[in-house]
C-alpha cells in the first residue's frame, strides 16, 4: 500500500530531538530498569524488556549501557515504586493524544501533563476518551532505499500483520505486540537494518493539521517530552509536506 510516510512529518524535528538525546537515554534506562525488575533480565521471556532493548539500540545506546541498566533492574528494588500511567486528551486541532508515563508520583506527573495540554489549547480527558482510536502494534520502520518487495516478503513470511510502503520508499512493518520480537529477529537475520523498532499505539484515523494548529501540536509534544516522567507521546495528527516545510 502506497501513501505518505511519517518521514516528512518528523524530519523537521530531528535537530531538536537530537538535542534531547541525553533525556531520551535517561527515559530508556528507566524503562530498562523497570522492565527487568518486573519481568526478569531475559528478553526472550520478557516482551517488555525486549521492546525496551530494541528501542535502546534504535537510539544508538551501547550494549554496555543497556546491559548495566538491565543488571540494575534485576539486582535492585529501585523500580518497585514505579508505575505505568496512561493519560488521554485532546490536543490542538482536535487531535487525539495518549501520554505514556512511568512515575513514582502520580500527583507530580498529572500536574505536568495537564499543564502541557492547557498551555497549548488542549484538554486532558478521562480514561477511555481517545484510547479507542488507537491500537497497540509493533512497528518496524525502514528508511528509503531498500528493496520493498524483499522486505515485504520476508516480513509476511516471519508473521507480520501488514507492510506499508510509501511514495518516498520508506517502509513500515506492523506486527502484534506478541510477534514483534520474532519478526524483527527474522528481518535482522535477512539483512534488513531498521531505522526504528518499537511497540507503539497506532491511530486508526488521522487529523489533518493546518498552519495554525500544527506548531501548537508540536509544542504540546515537546512540553510533554520535557517531563522526566513521560516515556511516550502518541497522537493522530498529520502534517502535510507543505506545512512541515514552514515549521
From Swiss-Prot:
Domain of life, per lineage: Bacteria
Sections of the chain in a coiled coil: none
Single biological process term from Gene Ontology: regulation of DNA-templated transcription
Main location: cytoplasm
GO molecular function, one term: DNA binding
Protein name as it appears in the record: Probable transcriptional regulatory protein plu2109
Cell compartments where the protein resides: Cytoplasm
GO CC annotations on file: cytosol
PANTHER family: TRANSCRIPTIONAL REGULATORY PROTEIN YEBC-RELATED, TRANSLATIONAL ACTIVATOR OF CYTOCHROME C OXIDASE 1
Record bears the keyword Cytoplasm: yes
Keyword entries, A-Z: Cytoplasm, DNA-binding, Transcription, Transcription regulation
Pfam family, one: TACO1_YebC_N
Record-stated family: Belongs to the TACO1 family.
Amino acid at each position: 500500500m502506497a501513501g505518505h510516510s511519517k518521514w516528512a512529518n518528523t524530519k523537521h524535528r530531528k535537530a531538536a530531538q537530537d538535542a534531547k538525546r541525553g533525556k531520551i537515554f535517561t527515559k530508556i534506562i528507566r524503562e530498562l530498569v523497570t522492565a527487568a525488575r518486573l519481568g526478569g533480565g531475559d528478553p526472550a521471556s520478557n516482551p517488555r524488556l525486549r521492546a525496551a532493548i530494541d528501542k535502546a539500540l534504535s537510539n544508538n545506546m551501547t550494549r554496555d549501557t543497556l546491559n548495566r541498566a538491565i543488571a540494575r533492574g534485576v539486582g535492585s528494588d529501585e523500580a518497585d515504586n514505579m508505575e505505568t500511567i496512561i493519560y488521554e486528551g485532546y490536543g490542538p486541532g482536535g487531535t487525539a493524544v495518549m501520554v505514556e508515563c512511568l512515575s513514582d508520583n502520580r500527583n507530580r506527573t498529572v500536574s505536568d501533563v495537564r499543564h502541557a495540554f492547557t498551555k497549548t489549547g488542549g484538554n486532558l480527558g478521562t480514561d477511555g476518551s481517545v484510547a479507542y482510536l488507537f491500537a497497540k502494534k509493533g512497528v518496524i520502520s525502514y528508511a528509503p532505499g531498500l528493496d520493498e518487495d524483499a522486505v515485504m516478503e520476508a516480513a509476511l513470511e516471519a508473521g507480520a500483520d501488514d507492510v506499508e510502503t510509501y511514495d518516498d520508499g520508506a517502509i513500515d512493518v506492523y506486527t502484534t505486540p506478541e510477534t514483534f520480537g520474532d519478526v524483527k529477529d527474522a528481518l535482522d537475520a535477512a539483512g534488513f537494518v531498521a531505522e526504528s523498532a518499537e511497540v507503539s499505539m497506532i491511530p486508526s484515523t488521522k487529523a489533518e493539521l493546518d498552519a495554525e494548529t500544527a506548531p501548537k501540536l508540536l509544542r504540546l509534544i515537546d512540553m510533554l517530552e520535557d517531563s522526566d516522567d513521560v516515556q511516550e507521546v502518541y497522537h493522530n495528527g498529520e502534517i502535510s509536506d507543505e506545512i512541515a516545510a514552514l515549521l
